[in-house]
Amino acid sequence: MLLIRPLLRANEARRHRTHVVVFFIFLVANAGGALTPLGDPPLFLGFLQGVDFFWTAGNLWRETLMMWGLLLAVFFAIDSYYDRLGREALPDLTDATPDAAGPLRIEGRVNFVLLAGILGLVLMSGLWKPGIVFHVMGTEVLLQNVVRDAGLVALAFASLWLTPATARAGNAFNWAPILEVAKLFAGIFITIGPVIAMLKAGVDGPFAAIVRLVNDSAGQPNNAMYFWATGLLSSFLDNAPTYLVFFNTAGGDARMLMTEGASTLAAISAAAVFMGANTYIGNAPNLMVKAIAESRGLRMPSFFGYMLWSGAVLVPIFVLMTFVFFR
């Protein structure tokens, strides 16, 4: 969210920009968060379940480097093709960052402090476990989560109050993308409950066939199937709760999964993070980036149009990754 507006501004004089935003979603909004629990919600849920903070960096760096390298190579090929066409520059476009505007400066620097506070609150909720639980309408709510969420809301209001209006105006900030994504994901999370409950039922539920696929006849995990089952469901059900379902299907014991089950946990983690990019609804930032780009006048692919991009670019990478890492 910090980078998409500067990226759009840097490329606004170009004729072909859609591929830039699509690959931004692939790389930054998804694959870029594969190495720590702060990078993507599925890994954060794993952290809350007891997975060590640096476990993902130590066990997913090969898959992540492969993903980054191949995506950057494909992007370079597409971008170079458009450049060779020789018609990239749009005529008579006013420079959004003229040299006469004065020296380079950063407005709203207080938000760096608030951002550090956000990271601190997120880490706190995974490290501080006082054991205090509240029951709200039949749902267990942990004290550390209450403190985290209240702190995040307070920091959001602090940012609104402390950030100069000129900084938001300069970034063409508006609430429309946030409201659009909030409404859509509110609907997704309301309707996803029964589906997640059916998945949690395991071999006794309606998705028993899928659950049985991830283990062989001897009960041993099939890492390739964990990778694809987690990934495909993450693409359409949101990757965070899907990660948690398959984490528990694999045993739910973080200590065991980080040691003898490391390859299985790696398959689940990689699938949830990487395949969250397969659709706009696989990961909330995907839709946010799309909405921000459209608010700046860029025509983005439709839901199924975006899936054509992900199918052509991402799926071959996932197939290769299966043979290299998850056989």
Residue ranges with predicted function:
Residues R17-F23, G102-L114, A172-A186, M307-S310:
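Alpha-helical transmembrane segments and their helix-start/interface "positive-inside/aromatic belt" motifs
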Residues L35, D40-A57, L119-V136, T322-F326:
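Transmembrane helix-loop junctions at the membrane interface of multipass transporters and ion channels
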Residues L115-V245:
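Transmembrane helical segments that form the transport core of multi-pass membrane transport proteins
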Residues I78-L115, A158-W175, R299-M300:
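Intrinsically disordered, low-complexity non-transmembrane regions of multi-pass membrane transporters
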Residues L2-H16, V20-F24, V28, L45-W61, ...:
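Membrane-interfacial helix-loop connectors
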Residues A13-H19, F23, L35, F54-A100, ...:
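Juxtamembrane and boundary regions of transmembrane helices in multi-pass small-molecule transporters
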Residues V22-I25, E107-L114, I118, R148-L155, ...:
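Hydrophobic alpha-helical transmembrane segments of polytopic
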Residues M1, A34-L38, T64-F76, S80, ...:
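Transmembrane alpha-helical segments of multi-pass membrane transport proteins and ion-pumping complexes
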